[in-house]
Amino acid sequence: KRVDKNGTPVTAKYTPTVTPVTPTAEDVESTGKQGQEQKQTPKFTEGDPVAPITISADNPAKFIDPETGEPTDATELPAMKDGKQVGTYTIDPATGKVTFIPNKDFVGTPDAITVQAKDANGTPATATYTPTVTPVTPTGEDKTTTGKQGQVQKETVKFTEGDSEVPMKIDADQPA
């Protein structure tokens, strides 16, 4: 409220409107071979340049704990499928990169893991990472021999790895 030289009062009102700045995130997926680790980094986008999302040691990316639905400081969580652990998720909090290490016998798609990052205002955004593990199936070649009773018969069966990136090991510790 103000008064002019003549003593006439005047009133004005100021009403600011605050618009929300909401960051966004993109879900990510990967596909890899059985027994091979997979990595992916969810992409976070600022809602406005005045509130950037800069993932760092001071503003770390975090997993959302699947049991509590809350952010956790844990950098390793079990990867689950139908209530069973099928591997492990790890996160680099300073970059947001998630690594999935499947159990050697797991094939399929585990439950996705959710990652959260916050912008400069502290507003969170979340994205999921969903890896898929494709099977690697080695093959064996049958062999047969014929001989008279009492005579020694020999033949070597042949095993072929399902993929060169997942070698088949046959030795004294892991015989055929």
Where in this protein do the model-derived segments appear?
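Extracellular interdomain linkers/hinges and stalk-like, low-complexity segments
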Residues: 4-56, 112, 120-174
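Acidic, turn/loop-rich segments in luminal/extracellular domains of secretory-pathway
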Residues: 1-14, 71-129
